[in-house]
């Protein structure tokens, strides 16, 4: 009897708590509608465009007011740790959802997340430049496939530190040479700081000329790099392969500067401080910093060709993404760094270099596969122009633009995976077991990055896989003197400081390629890859706008609900209108809460009730 009484009391308390929770939510919903009703049209658009309204009942009126005041005062200053380029444990959020992070991009435009799951670690960085409108998305993935992953990591990190001791002279000199940091640069992870700097004789940008002229130590470093460079890539090849102009992309840039480097210059400084080497490409090509664009208007021909010299406000903003994966057979490259091992790794000939390009609706994709010393590197680069951008910044980074971008990312993942799997079937060397093992490993060893001014990254553990932030330029098309499209996939893999580079030579350009459906192994993959099935949509839909622009939405009629109006309910939130509610009226005469229908129309172009097109097709504009 006592047990039944206690159970009844417990259930009564639970139901009372549920009722209180429901009442609190209803109160918050009422406060939300009242808050929106009292907003001026300017304040409403400000909060809507920055996705600060949220869902009715989700936030209190005080929270909404705080968001409004915060957005009016301007974005908060960037983390001081970020300006220093150091790692911070505050960024580590293992449980955070990547989807939540991507949604936050639309609010802040500058976010960093990192985490770890098992033997996999990831780091994602988003940067928006309000001056140029450029959006840079960088995803780096490190995978340690050794059975003793923890031991291997602990074993290699001291090795990396010891090796970097050889380069104190070089790194400290580069830090002195490059005191100015880029305000929008991503903070590097450990593997980025340990990546290989490539130093070759290519025409430098303005920043690189300045860096080289300041320090004889830097020239000595470059000389050491040249002495240890593989005989397969003599310096005489560099001028012939370093430049090529692609008319459809209107830029030219050197690509081989990252493909070859010295094991003694493997550890370089943070992304912001590095000017020589891989960042040459970033500066000359994609220009993530608007202030830097203005200051370098008189830069090199690379800069002029990319449209920087015309001013960041005049050239179309661009999203650049890089998706990379390195496949390494477990058990290889575990020996300690030595002259003999470096010589062996550099004496093996790159083979099976393949390049493939496709362009659809302005989205240019480039794929490359190359192999050297048993390390096979696959690179997929996507260049996405944003055609509709306001001067205030990346205003089109709504859920529509984000989803379009992510569809391109995931399509790139799919094509890259297909490229890898189909290539594995025709692998000329290695046993069947090795091929099967590589095919299985490739599912968890892919990484993507989008670049503006970042540097190539390589892993510091013996069998890890990482993405390259600067490879947005590294895998873009280059060419030989014959003018054919070609590509250099300039990854440098280091196994316990054993460097091996992979470079693509020339490949024929082909339009279109049949792709088999790609499946993703979710069991051991990173959270980011769980987005694949959601965003990997039909490519036929890439060119179709999925919603209305803010200007198109604002042109729709809006009114306030009056006391004499017939009682109606918003079909989006299923809430009755009250006096003073702001309603938006569609051409089909259906009305909705302004905040409800605006969110709907940002991702859809039809009325939620009758499914009629809100705008005639002739009046639609592409939102991407």
UniProtKB/Swiss-Prot annotation:
Annotated localization: Nucleus
InterPro entries assigned: RING_finger_E3_ligase, Znf_RING, Znf_RING/FYVE/PHD
Motif (PDZ-binding): 621-624
Group of enzyme by EC: transferase
Start-end of Low complexity biased regions: 142-153, 455-507
Residue span of region Disordered: 1-25, 72-251, 257-276, 291-363, 424-522
Gene3D superfamilies with a match to the protein in the record: Zinc/RING finger domain, C3HC4 (zinc finger)
Feature: compositional bias, Polar residues: 104-132, 165-188, 291-315, 340-356
Catalytic reaction equation(s): S-ubiquitinyl-[E2 ubiquitin-conjugating enzyme]-L-cysteine + [acceptor protein]-L-lysine = [E2 ubiquitin-conjugating enzyme]-L-cysteine + N(6)-ubiquitinyl-[acceptor protein]-L-lysine
Record keywords: Acetylation, Disease variant, Intellectual disability, Metal-binding, Nucleus, Phosphoprotein, Transcription, Transcription regulation, Transferase, Ubl conjugation pathway, Zinc, Zinc-finger
Composition skew (Basic and acidic residues), residue ranges: 1-11, 214-229, 329-339
Domain of life: Eukaryota
Composition bias, Gly residues: 445-454
MF (Gene Ontology): transcription corepressor activity; ubiquitin protein ligase activity; ubiquitin-protein transferase activity; zinc ion binding
GO biological process, one term: protein ubiquitination
PANTHER family: E3 UBIQUITIN-PROTEIN LIGASE RLIM (PTHR45931:SF4), SI:CH211-59O9.10 (PTHR45931)
Known partners and oligomeric status: Interacts with LIM/homeobox factors such as LHX3. Interacts with LDB1, LDB2 and SIN3A. Interacts with LIMK1. Interacts (via N-terminus) with TERF1. Interacts (via C-terminus) with ESR1.
Remaining remarks: Acts as a positive coregulator of ESR1-mediated transcription in breast cancer cells.
Family: Belongs to the RNF12 family.
Protein name per the record: E3 ubiquitin-protein ligase RLIM
């Amino acid at each position: 009897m006592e047990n039944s009484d206690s159970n009844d009391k417990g259930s009564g308390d639970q139901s009372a708590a549920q009722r209180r929770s429901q009442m609190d939510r209803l109160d918050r919903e009422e406060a939300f509608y009242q808050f929106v009703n009292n907003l001026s049209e300017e304040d409403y658009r400000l909060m809507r465009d920055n996705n600060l309204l949220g869902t009715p009942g989700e936030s209190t009126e005080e929270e909404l007011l705080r968001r409004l005041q915060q957005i009016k005062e301007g974005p908060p200053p960037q983390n001081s740790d970020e300006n220093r380029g150091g790692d911070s444990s505050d960024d580590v959020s293992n449980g955070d959802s990547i989807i939540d992070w991507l949604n936050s991009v639309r609010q802040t435009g500058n976010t960093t997340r990192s985490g770890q799951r098992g033997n996999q670690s990831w780091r994602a960085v988003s940067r928006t430049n309000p001056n140029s409108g450029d959006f840079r998305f960088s995803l780096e993935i490190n995978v340690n496939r050794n059975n003793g992953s923890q031991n291997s990591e602990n074993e290699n990190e001291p090795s990396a530190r010891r090796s970097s001791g050889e380069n104190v002279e070089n790194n400290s000199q580069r830090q002195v040479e490059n005191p100015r940091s880029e305000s929008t640069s991503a903070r590097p992870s450990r593997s980025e700081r340990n990546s290989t700097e490539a130093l070759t004789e290519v025409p430098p940008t303005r920043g690189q000329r300045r860096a080289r002229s300041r320090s004889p130590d830097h020239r000595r470093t470059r000389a050491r790099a040249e002495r240890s460079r593989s005989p397969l890539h003599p310096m005489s090849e560099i001028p012939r392969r370093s430049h090529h102009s692609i008319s459809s992309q209107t830029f030219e840039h050197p690509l081989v500067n990252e493909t070859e480097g010295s094991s003694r210059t493997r550890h370089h400084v943070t992304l912001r401080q590095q000017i020589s080497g891989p960042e040459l490409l970033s500066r000359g090509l994609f220009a993530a910093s608007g202030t830097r664009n203005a200051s370098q208007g008189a830069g090199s021909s690379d800069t002029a060709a990319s449209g920087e010299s015309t001013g960041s406000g005049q050239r179309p903003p661009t999203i650049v993404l890089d998706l990379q994966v390195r496949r390494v057979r477990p058990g290889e490259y575990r020996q300690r760094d030595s002259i003999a091992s470096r010589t062996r790794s550099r004496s093996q000939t790159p083979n099976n270099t393949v390049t493939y390009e496709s362009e659809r609706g302005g989205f240019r994709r480039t794929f490359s596969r190359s192999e050297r010393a048993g390390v096979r590197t696959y690179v997929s680069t996507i260049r996405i122009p944003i055609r509709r951008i306001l001067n205030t910044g990346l205003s089109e980074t709504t859920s529509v633009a984000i989803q379009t971008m992510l569809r391109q990312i995931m399509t790139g993942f799919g094509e890259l995976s297909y490229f890898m799997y189909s290539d594995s079937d025709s692998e000329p060397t290695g046993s069947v077991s090795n091929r099967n093992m590589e095919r299985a490993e490739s599912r968890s060893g892919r990484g993507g990055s989008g670049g503006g001014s970042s540097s190539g990254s390589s892993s510091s553990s013996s069998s890890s896989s990482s993405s390259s932030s600067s490879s947005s330029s590294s895998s873009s098309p280059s060419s030989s003197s014959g003018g054919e499209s070609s590509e250099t996939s300039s990854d440098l893999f280091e196994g316990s400081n054993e460097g091996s580079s992979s470079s693509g030579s020339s490949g024929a350009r082909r339009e279109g390629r049949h792709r088999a459906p790609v499946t993703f192994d979710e069991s051991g993959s990173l959270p980011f890859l769980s987005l694949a099935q959601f965003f990997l949509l039909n490519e036929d839909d890439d060119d179709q706008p999925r919603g209305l622009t803010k200007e198109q939405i604002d042109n729709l009629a809006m009114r306030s609900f009056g006391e004499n109006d017939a009682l109606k309910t918003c079909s989006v939130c299923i809430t009755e209108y009250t006096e003073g509610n702001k309603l938006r009226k569609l051409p089909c005469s259906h009305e909705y809460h302004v905040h409800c229908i605006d969110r709907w129309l940002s991702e859809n172009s039809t009325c939620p009730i009758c499914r009629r097109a809100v705008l005639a097709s002739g009046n639609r504009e592409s939102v991407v």
